[in-house]
Amino acid sequence: MAVREDITQDTLMGGRVHLRQPGRGYRAAIDPVLLAAAVPAGAGEDVLDVGAGVGAAALCLARRVAECRVRGIELQRELVHLATENVRLNEMGKRVEIMVGNLAHPPPRIAPGSFSHVMANPPYLDPAANDPSPDRGRRTAMMESGGGLALWINHCIAMARPGGTITMIQRADRLDTLLSLLTRRAGDVVIFPLWPFDPFDEANAKPASRVILRAKVGSHAPTKIMGGLALHDANGEYTADAEAVLRHGAPLLLGPL
């Protein structure tokens, strides 16, 4: 298959997932791999990917978990076209489908309360505190609009079955907002920091800039903070634990449900 000049062909999970994506603007890197690794899906379960982009997280999850089914919705039509190509490229047509849709008015086939798990990589940036990117695709992917994080949380909760899980990756400085939006609607929240370096290495330790958050819809169990994952060693290389997830398809274990 020929690749257009403005489209690159990349791989994730050590070549297990092939990905065509825009050469400019927002590009899938490690975040969708980490997100997919944290979803506790099993064979035969249905998963919704909210804001699916070019299908990176959906395909990583489907590659890791045999026989799970993943549907995704994405606002940008051009990304859905690429996602559909990526589904074919990875021979996942029987288990992965990405559709055009928005959170306020999802496609009719995305029925509320029908998914065992919902995953999302919401826009990271609050427009009140950040300047928008001049690139439209990157701006849409990275900058909140409309109902902001509340719209994303409302949609994810609505789509999950009672007792189903919501898994998100987000900036650590948005954690207060996420937790307040989940209050009394989902519990058993797990906060899993993504550390740039080993947090116990005094010479290199830095605060976690991103976290993975998992919650169970309808639960009232207390919130837990896990040890998280150190992404890099002192030399700037991926740690063995990060390599296992990013290149070898290992799951991120956030604790029992």
Residue ranges and their predicted role:
Residues 2-42:
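Class I SAM-dependent transferase core
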Residues 20, 97-99, 190-192:
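General small-molecule cofactor/ligand-binding pocket signal
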Residues 24, 146-199:
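Conserved Class I SAM-dependent methyltransferase catalytic core
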Residues 35, 121, 152, 215:
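Residue-level signal for inorganic ion chemistry
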Residues 38-134:
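Conserved SAM/SAH cofactor-binding pocket of Class I
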Residues 47-50, 86, 115-117, 178, ...:
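Structured catalytic cores of enzymes that bind and process phosphorylated ligands/cofactors
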Residues 122-152, 158:
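Mobile active-site "lid"/loop adjacent to the S-adenosyl-L-methionine
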Residues 202-257:
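SAM/dcSAM-binding transferase cores
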